[in-house]
């Protein structure tokens, strides 16, 4: 493994401005998308009962755990036997509403609250569970460099690596996330957000 140090391309002032902009945009989005969020919650409640929000522990800035929020897309106790890396086509664990939400990435809406709170940024590496981080670290210990920055809702790696359903894909995602870490800027973030929105509008699954 290469003995290279990976550093955040943003300086302290840029990081503070990025966090401030994320906070303002998240506040506006929480208000603007509240009717859509309520509609999603009602649809989940009618089909499969409560809870409508699913929370899961992920690892974020400085390696600290936090709870990520999503609209529940799977049946209750879908992972009672433990985490499952492989997402099966036509996954029977998904509810009908959940499948629709995932297809249009609406299950991610509650993560606006994570951005508002400061757990996450609008753009950054996707946060992972410790269960999978431990497995990744066995193959590539560079993962800890990602702890320098807040995880994001969309990421550079998601655009070009798709759903990470195998360990080779997870390792490729790590390499892409490290590239983002070393090159991130407001302009880079804007391009990632734009490409993500285009993919969502055209129904691309990633």
Q: What are these language model-derived features?
A:
Residues 22, 107-108, 177, 189:
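Acidic active-site catalytic centers that drive phospho-/nucleotidyl reactions
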Residues 87-150, 193-196, 200:
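A short, structured surface patch at a secondary-structure boundary
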Residues 1-6:
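Hydrophobic transmembrane alpha-helix segments characteristic of membrane transport
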Residues 54-93, 154-173:
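Short, glycine-rich, amphipathic interfacial segments at transmembrane boundaries or analogous
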Residues 8, 12-13, 142-206:
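C-terminal terminal-structure detector
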Residues 9-77, 114, 186-206:
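A hydrophobic, helix-centered structural microdomain
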Residues 26, 41, 54, 95-99, ...:
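Positions in alpha-helical segments
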